Amino acid sequence: MTTYVRERPENVASIFVALGDPTRREIFERVAARPQSVSELAGDLPVSRPAVSQHLRVLKDAGLVSDRAAGNRRIYSMDRCGLQDLRAYLDFFWNQALAAFKTAVEQPPKEQR
């Protein structure tokens, strides 16, 4: 897993940047719940449709959302590939923490050494 983290850091960095903005997180959570158009998303958010489009572009560039044509509009949905990149990155650190915990638990107490 170390190799993965070293080979693809730009993917993870762009995901953290994309999710670092509260409006983008809200948009991402909404499209993760169900596919939506820009108009649907903008209807409930305190930002304009052009701003929603810009946020979606950042999320799409990070690999977190994808879009498809539906008539004269685009429908956005969660892209699982971006989440897989983030999960692999976080799993790397989780596995390190678990290994360190296992080592600590398996060591005899100091008075028994």
Where on the chain are the PLM-derived regions?
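C-terminal regulatory/oligomerization modules of transcriptional regulators
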Residues: 1-15, 30-44, 49, 58-62, ...
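Short basic coil micro-motifs at the edges of alpha-helical modules that engage polyanionic partners
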Residues: 16-17, 75
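Conserved strand-loop elements at the edges of beta-sheets that form or border functional pockets
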Residues: 21, 67-69
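Short, Lys/Arg-rich nucleic-acid/phosphate-binding segment
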Residues: 69-75
